[in-house]
């Protein structure tokens, strides 16, 4: 029985990796070994950063809320506590969007938080 070398299977597997490595710099888009290593690392980074993105957006929202709160004479923590006491249940994403796009509405929310604290 003749030996099966698997040329088409190997070619397809390598072609798939090389297609994923398109746009990489240097030998990483030309040589299979370098490309497969880089694709592996890139996928590792993509997995890690999909998790990281959530905390980075939360940090951004908190920074925006804090800046807007300080313009209205409150710290971030006092604003959040005041909103909770006032019974205003808004998540940080919504608050950050209001702080960024609609200063008057955010000022009204800050006033409600101040009243609830006093």
Curated annotation (Swiss-Prot):
Gene Ontology cellular component annotations, sorted alphabetically: ribonucleoprotein complex; ribosome
One GO term of the biological process aspect: ribosomal large subunit assembly
Entry-linked InterPro entries: Ribosomal_bL20 (IPR005813), RIBOSOMAL_L20_CS (IPR049946), Ribosomal_protein_bL20_C (IPR035566)
Keyword Ribonucleoprotein: yes
One annotated GO molecular function: structural constituent of ribosome
CDD domains from the UniProt entry: Ribosomal_L20
Pfam families membership: Ribosomal_L20
Superkingdom as given in the UniProt entry: Bacteria
Keyword field: Ribonucleoprotein, Ribosomal protein, RNA-binding, rRNA-binding
Signal peptide, first to last residue: none
Similarity-based family: Belongs to the bacterial ribosomal protein bL20 family.
Task of the protein: Binds directly to 23S ribosomal RNA and is necessary for the in vitro assembly process of the 50S ribosomal subunit. It is not involved in the protein synthesizing functions of that subunit.
Record protein name field: Large ribosomal subunit protein bL20
Native source organism of the sequence: Lactobacillus johnsonii (strain CNCM I-12250 / La1 / NCC 533)
Gene this chain is encoded by: rplT
């Amino acid at each position: 029985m003749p030996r099966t070398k698997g040329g088409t299977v190997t070619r397809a597997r390598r072609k798939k990796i090389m297609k994923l490595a398109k746009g990489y710099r240097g030998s990483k888009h030309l040589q299979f070994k370098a490309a497969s290593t880089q694709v592996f690392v890139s996928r590792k980074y993509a997995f890690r950063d999909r998790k990281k993105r959530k905390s980075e957006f939360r940090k951004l929202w908190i920074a925006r809320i804090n800046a807007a709160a300080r313009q209205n004479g409150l710290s971030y923590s006092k604003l959040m506590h005041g909103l909770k006491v006032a019974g205003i249940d808004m998540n940080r994403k919504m608050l950050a969007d209001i702080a960024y796009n609609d200063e008057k509405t955010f000022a009204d929310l800050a006033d409600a938080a101040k009243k609830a604290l006093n």
